[in-house]
Amino acid sequence: MFASRFKVCRQILENVWQTKKLTLKQKFLISELQKQKKNKKQSDFSIQLQTIKKLSLFYGNLPIKKMQRAKTHTYIDKKNSLLFNIEKRLDVILVRLNFCSTMFQARQLISHKNICVNYKKVNIPGFQVSNGDLISIQENSLDFFKSNIRKNFQTNRIRRMKPNHLEVNYKTLKAVVLYEPQQIQFPYKIDLDLLD
């Protein structure tokens, strides 16, 4: 794993990159740091900050300020509405549909105007998709996406289960958002109660 990515793993004390594996030396370093940290008492603020960092990394380095700003706009159920607003972003949906393997790849493809929502080109990665919106791929990019999806299925880099709130046709590479997401699965432990 690259040094810059491992630096993040050292701060959070676990591997937050789903596609990258740690070397034996890196695993040993993290386990030693975890042992040292068990002896120290963490403040509530540091635990909350670590949770927000994990969430930010899970969503491809989404700026923490954006997440906190989204949290302050909602009053009823802050943690769920924050996560569901993030889950309705176009870049996140492309990763959930397995059209892209990483958030960074999804953002790049959106900014190059390869994605359409309701047959209109969109170049904003944070575009909020509504229920019933049709997500499609530009004609000139279809071959790239099909080869990317095929490669990801062969290497098992993508999860074969798609979320229930999305309906996708992999032959035409079109998808529809059916309803609001009901449940979000994380590859590592995140205590969402700390987001209140």
Curated annotation (Swiss-Prot):
GO terms for cellular component: mitochondrion; small ribosomal subunit. One of its GO terms (biological process) is translation. InterPro entries: Ribosomal_uS4, Ribosomal_uS4_bac-type, Ribosomal_uS4_CS, S4_RNA-bd, S4_RNA-bd_sf. Coiled coil: none annotated. It is found in: Mitochondrion. Residues 88-154 form the S4 RNA-binding domain. The keyword NADP does not apply. It holds the Pfam family S4. Gene3D superfamilies: Ribosomal Protein S4 Delta 41, Chain A, domain 1, RNA-binding S4 domain. Keywords: Mitochondrion, Ribonucleoprotein, Ribosomal protein, RNA-binding, rRNA-binding. Belongs to the universal ribosomal protein uS4 family. This is Small ribosomal subunit protein uS4m. The gene is RPS4.
